[in-house]
C-alpha cells in the first residue's frame, strides 16, 4: 500500500508537468474516462457535503458559507447523476454481464473433473472455482445495484426535478430517494465481500501458478534449455508472478477499505443511532469523503 501511495505521489507531479507537454498524459486519461470523471465528481461532492455538515453543526443553516456549500454539493450531485449515467451503460453494464458469464462458467467448471491434471483433488478444484464464482457474484450484485441507482432511479428523479410539472408524486419521489440509500448499501456490502474473496482467490491462484512453474509445466513457454537455466528462469518467473499478484492484492485491499468506509457511512445514514443528527451527518460525510479519495487515488494509480 505504501508503494502504491509512493508511486501515486511521483505520478501526480509527473502528470501535472506532462499536462503542458504531452497530450496523452495521465491526467488526460483520467479526465477522458467516464469512470475517472465520476470519481472526481464524487470526491468534490463529498468534500462539499462534509463542509456543509460541519458548518451546519457549528454555525447553523443561516450563514452564507453553509448555503454556498449546500448549493455546491447539490450542483455536484446533479452533475454526477449525468456523468454516472454514461458510466453505468458504458462501463458498468458490460462489466456486469461479464461478471455474470464468468460466475456461471466457474460454477460449471466446479462440477467437472480436472482432465488434464488428474493429480489435483476434485475438492481443491471445486473450492477454487467456487471462490471465483462467489467473487463474480458479488461483482454482479454491485453492478446491478449501480445500474439500478445511476442508470434508472437517479436519472428519473433528476428529470422529475427539471420539469415544470413533475410527473412523480411526493410520496413516490420520497420512496425512490430513500431506496437509493438501501440499494447502494447493498452495493457497498457486496463490494467488501467481493474484495475479500478476490484477495483469497488471488493468493490461492498465485500459489497454484508458482507450483506449476516449480513442477516444470511452464518450461516450454519459458524457453529454458538446461537444468541450471531452468532453475534460474523458474525463480525469476516465480518472483514476477508474486510481484504481479501482490499488486492485485494491494488494489483489492484498497477497494475493501474504500467500500468498508462507505458501509460505515451507510450505517450512520440509515440506522437510528443514539447520537445527534449533526454528528451523524459529519461522520457519514467524513467516511464518504475518505472512501472517495481512496477510490480516486486507486483509479489514478491504475490509469
Where are these regions (language model features)?
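Glycine-rich, hydrophobic membrane-spanning regions of integral membrane proteins that mediate transport
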Residues: 1-303
